[in-house]
From Swiss-Prot:
InterPro entries: PurM-like_C_dom (IPR010918), PurM-like_C_sf (IPR036676), PurM-like_N (IPR016188), PurM-like_N_sf (IPR036921), PurM_cligase (IPR004733). Keywords: ATP-binding, Cytoplasm, Ligase, Nucleotide-binding, Purine biosynthesis. It is found in: Cytoplasm. Transmembrane segments: none annotated. This is Phosphoribosylformylglycinamidine cyclo-ligase. The keyword Nucleotidyltransferase does not apply. It comes from Colwellia psychrerythraea (strain 34H / ATCC BAA-681). SUPFAM superfamilies: PurM C-terminal domain-like, PurM N-terminal domain-like.
Length: 346
C-alpha cells in the first residue's frame, strides 16, 4: 500500500495569502489620505480608474518609473523602513515635474521572499506620505511574495507615476538660449543616488553609522528622504516661463544637466555659489573621491537645476523660497564652442 502524500497548500510553498490581505487592511487608511477627486473607486480592483483633471485645453499624459537603488540595502540593514517609500515617490514625481507635468496617480511594486506585514506597512506609509507631499493619489500596487527569489528579510520596491500637462506648456529645453540663468534647489542629502559608492566608503572605513557628523548620525544623513520639489515647482511654473529643469540623479551634474540642453548650449556653474552639505565632504574625504567623480555620482547638495530668462531670476528665487525651497543663483547658459563640455565650472 502506497504511503499517503501530504496535502500541500500555497502557504506551505511560502506564499501567505492571509498576510497579503492583512497588509491591504493595514494600508487602507494611508491610501485614502492620498486620494484626489479624479480617482474613481478604491483598492482591490483589477485596475485603477482616474479621470483627467478639469481645466486643461489639450492635456497630455507623462509617465515615469523608478526605484531607490541600493539605498534600500542600507535602509534594510539599518531596519529603517519608514522613509524609503518617500524616496520612491520622489524619484518618480521629480522626473515628471521637470517636464512640466503635475503628478496625478502613483502605483507601487513591492517584492519579497516572505511578506513581513509590519515592514511592508511601514514602506507603504512612506509611499503615501510621498504622494501627499506631491499631491498625487496612490491608486494601487502589487505585493509579490516570491520564495526563493530574495534573501530572508530583503525586499525591493519600484514606483510608477502618471502626470498630466498642457501640451503647449510641456518643457523640453528647446527654448534654452545663451544668457539664460541657472537656479539651484537645495537637496536634503544624497537623495537616492550613489549608494553603491556610499556603501563602499562605509565598508572600507568600517564606519559606525551611529557616529555623529555635525550632531546628526551618519545613518540619518544618508537615509534622509529625497526632497520632493513638485508643489514649489508647480507654483513657479504658474509665475515664470521656465525654459528647462533638470533632476540631479544618477550621473550627477555631468549627465543630467545636458539632458535638457540644446547641443549648442553650455551650463556654466558658479562653484562658489554654495557649500556642499557636510555629508558630501565626509564621503569625499573618507573615500578619497575626486571632485569630478563626486559631481558625476552625487548631487553634492543640488537636487534640481532650473533654467529661466535672465530677468526672472529674482522672481523665481522669491517664489521658490516662499514655498519652502533653499534656492540660489547657480550660474548661466553660454554658447558652447566645438569640443567643449556642456557643463563647466567657472
Amino acid at each position: 500500500m502506497s504511503e499517503q502524500k501530504q496535502s500541500l497548500s500555497y502557504k506551505d510553498a511560502g506564499v501567505d495569502i492571509d498576510a497579503g490581505n492583512a497588509l491591504v487592511e493595514n494600508i487602507k487608511g494611508a491610501v485614502k489620505r492620498t486620494t484626489r477627486p479624479e480617482v474613481m473607486g478604491g483598492l482591490g480592483g483589477f485596475g485603477s480608474v482616474c479621470q483627467l483633471p478639469t481645466g486643461y485645453k489639450e492635456p497630455v499624459l507623462v509617465a515615469g518609473t523608478d526605484g531607490v537603488g541600493t539605498k534600500l540595502r542600507l535602509a534594510i540593514d539599518l531596519a529603517k523602513h519608514d522613509t524609503v517609500g518617500i524616496d520612491l515617490v520622489a524619484m518618480c514625481v521629480n522626473d515628471l515635474i521637470v517636464q512640466g507635468a503635475e503628478p496625478l496617480f502613483f502605483l507601487d511594486y513591492y517584492a519579497t521572499a516572505k511578506l513581513d506585514v509590519a515592514v511592508a506597512s511601514s514602506v507603504v506609509e512612506g509611499i503615501a506620505e510621498g504622494c501627499i507631499q506631491s499631491g498625487c493619489a496612490l491608486v494601487g500596487g502589487e505585493t509579490a511574495e516570491m520564495p526563493g527569489m530574495y534573501h530572508k528579510g530583503d525586499y525591493d520596491i519600484a514606483g510608477f507615476c502618471v502626470g498630466v500637462a498642457e501640451k503647449s506648456r510641456l518643457i523640453d529645453g528647446t527654448n534654452v538660449a545663451a544668457g539664460d540663468q541657472l537656479i539651484a534647489l537645495g537637496a536634503s542629502g544624497p537623495h537616492s543616488n550613489g549608494f553603491s559608492l556610499i556603501r563602499k566608503v562605509l565598508e572600507v572605513n568600517n564606519t559606525d553609522t551611529n557616529e555623529l557628523l555635525e550632531g546628526k548620525k551618519i545613518a540619518d544623513h544618508l537615509l534622509e528622504p529625497t526632497k520632493i520639489y513638485v508643489k514649489s515647482v508647480l507654483e513657479l511654473l504658474k509665475n515664470v516661463d521656465v525654459h528647462a529643469l533638470s533632476h540631479i540623479t544618477g550621473g550627477g551634474f555631468w549627465e543630467n544637466i545636458p539632458r535638457v540642453l540644446p547641443e549648442t548650449a553650455q551650463a556654466v556653474i558658479k562653484g562658489d555659489s554654495w557649500q556642499w552639505p557636510s555629508i558630501f565632504n565626509w564621503l569625499q574625504e573618507n573615500g578619497n573621491i575626486t571632485e569630478h567623480e563626486m559631481y558625476r555620482t552625487f548631487n553634492c547638495g543640488v537636487g534640481m537645476v532650473i533654467v529661466v530668462p535672465a530677468d526672472k531670476v529674482a522672481q523665481s528665487i522669491e517664489v521658490l523660497t516662499a514655498h519652502g525651497e533653499n534656492a540660489w543663483h547657480l550660474g548661466e547658459i553660454a554658447d558652447k564652442a566645438d569640443g567643449e563640455e556642456q557643463v563647466v565650472f567657472a
